[in-house]
Amino acid sequence: KFDADSMNECDWMQIDEFKRKVLALQQDGVKFISLTEAYDKIANDKFRNHKYVVFTFDDGNASLKEILPWLEEQKIPTTLFINGKYLDGKSYRKNPKEKYLTYEELFAMTSPLVEIGSHGWEHIRATEQSEKEFEESVKMNIAVLEKHPRYIPYHAYTYGCHNERYDEILNIQNLVPVLIEGNKN
């Protein structure tokens, strides 16, 4: 997130600082690739002799509108994991100051450098939901997101919380599970 009104001070960054870090990675010879390209490289053992970075942004925070044009100028692919409930422009999580992309804003993002994946209907840990609730959350979110021309069948678990049964639910929905490590993006 690129907004000081974010839920907590640990999950946002000033845009200028982010740009400096990205440019430093470029100077270091890092190649930026899409999540789908990374998945293909992992599946086919093609990661040899290169440094790669994949940018993913969870939730659909409205501050993405401030950085996505710059990432596109730099030809850097990005994956957005979206919570569909917040696309209505009026539903917010715990912080009413925190704004989210609207349905119209998300569906205007059609650059080939942007991929759109699922993050659940609401920002709730899978393991805090019953299996039925989790499955319904995923289905509701996919019903909205699969209409997007840049939709990819990937689901990022909220805070990386999951278990084998939830992985099976995603598999039945033909979704690739995406995890974070150590609650760090």
Predicted feature descriptions by range:
Residues 1-10, 50-53, 61-63, 72-164, ...:
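Metal-dependent polysaccharide deacetylase catalytic core of the NodB/CE4 family, i.e.
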Residues 1-53:
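N-terminal pre-catalytic segment of deacetylase/amide-hydrolase enzymes
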Residues 17, 24, 70-73, 108, ...:
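Alpha-helical scaffold elements within enzyme catalytic domains, especially in hydrolases
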Residues 34-36, 62-68:
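Extended catalytic core of nucleotide-activated donor transferases of GT-like folds
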Residues 172-182:
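Catalytic-core region of carbohydrate-active enzymes that cleave or remodel glycosidic bonds
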